[in-house]
Amino acid sequence: VSIRAVMRVYAERSGDAGARTPKEIFEIAEGIRPGNREAAIAAFEELGEMAGDALASAITLIDGLIVIGGGLSGASKYILPVLLKEMNAQTGMMDGARFGRLQKEVYDLDDEKSFAGFARGEAVEVLVPGTNRKVGYDPCKRIGVTFSKQGANRSIAMGAYVFALNHLSK
């Protein structure tokens, strides 16, 4: 999962031996620059598939939102659908039984309808063992994926600012 992989896949699929940058490949995918549009889109889709596989493995270890940043995030419209498909994919057993590769549902937080499903949840009340008290519980396991819209420099600066504010009063 890298810019070099996007460049390699585009070169393999298009037959274009020129060293195209990911920005140029994105412009080809958008139809702004001449080149093999299908190969350009496929290069970003393959990145989405590989990133989805890696993130599906990583998210089994942590519980949190996934925010994807960096220069390739500009191509999110080509990457995200395949990434979500990979993360929400099924896997199977030798006997043919199928089940989700993750115990969680993965949601696109940049899509209004998907975000509504993520935010809604399925709250139910459960009895606290040994008491008569009930508490709210949401059995719906879910994870959200989004792309950074502000860039690494701004995100780091904002984080440092909030960190400093939190430590001024100490």
Regions found by a protein language model. Name each.
Residues 1-170:
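ATP-binding/phosphotransfer module of carbohydrate and carboxylate kinases, centering on a glycine-rich
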